[in-house]
Curated annotation (Swiss-Prot):
A GO MF term: unfolded protein binding
Assembly, per entry: Homotetramer, a dimer of dimers. One homotetramer interacts with 1 SecA dimer.
Alphabetical list of InterPro entries matching this protein: SecB (IPR003708), SecB-like_sf (IPR035958)
GO biological process, one term: protein folding
Job description of the protein: One of the proteins required for the normal export of preproteins out of the cell cytoplasm. It is a molecular chaperone that binds to a subset of precursor proteins, maintaining them in a translocation-competent state. It also specifically binds to its receptor SecA.
PANTHER family listed in its UniProt record: PROTEIN-EXPORT PROTEIN SECB, PTHR36918
Family statement drawn from the similarity comment of this UniProt entry: Belongs to the SecB family.
UniProt keyword list: Chaperone, Cytoplasm, Protein transport, Translocation, Transport
Compartments reported by the entry: Cytoplasm
Protein's name according to its UniProt entry: Protein-export protein SecB
Predominant location: cytoplasm
One GO term describing the cellular component: cytoplasm
Length: 158
């Protein structure tokens, strides 16, 4: 029997927390007097680090910027963190877990926090659509593969 079949996979959420929150309405109160047809921009970023053997921190940064023309109506940023115990998962599976599975868990918390901040800023309700972190992670892997192939071709041509 192989060792891999004897290894059990284990995943546990230890803690979910808000690491950082920022809300700015730099053009208030003038922005409230304009017709509300904003251009909303959403930026996502994830970072992970190993805190101890098999214990990882994953931080999902969600930044939402709403602009009316050239003026920023509001800028909202939330860093939602989580501490996860992950055992028996390595390599690409671990990267997928940290880069997609954990952010999928964290996103609803970050979304709720952003919705609350925007509401407290007295702006119209903002509902962020669900994000497919699995698809984003697959795009990331594809970009990494293309970059490494491009680097190999450059070396072969030299």
């Amino acid at each position: 029997m192989s060792e891999q079949s004897n290894t059990e996979m284990a995943f546990q959420i230890q803690r979910i927390y808000t690491k950082d929150i920022s809300f700015e309405a730099p053009n208030a109160p003038q922005v409230f007097q304009q017709e509300w047809q904003p251009e909303v921009k959403l930026d996502l970023d994830t970072a992970s680090s190993e805190l101890a053997q098999g214990v990882y921190e994953v931080v999902l940064r969600v930044t939402v910027t709403a602009a009316l023309g050239e003026e920023t109506a509001f800028l909202c940023e939330v860093q939602q963190g989580g501490i996860f115990s992950i055992d028996g998962i390595e390599g690409t599976q671990l990267a997928h877990c940290l880069g997609a599975y954990c952010p999928n868990i964290l996103f609803p918390y970050a979304r709720e926090c952003i919705t609350s901040l925007v509401s407290r800023g007295t702006f119209p309700q903002l509902n962020l659509a669900p994000v497919n972190f699995d698809a984003l992670f697959m795009n990331y892997l594809q970009q990494q593969a293309e970059q490494s192939q491009g680097g190999e071709q450059t070396e072969q041509e030299a």
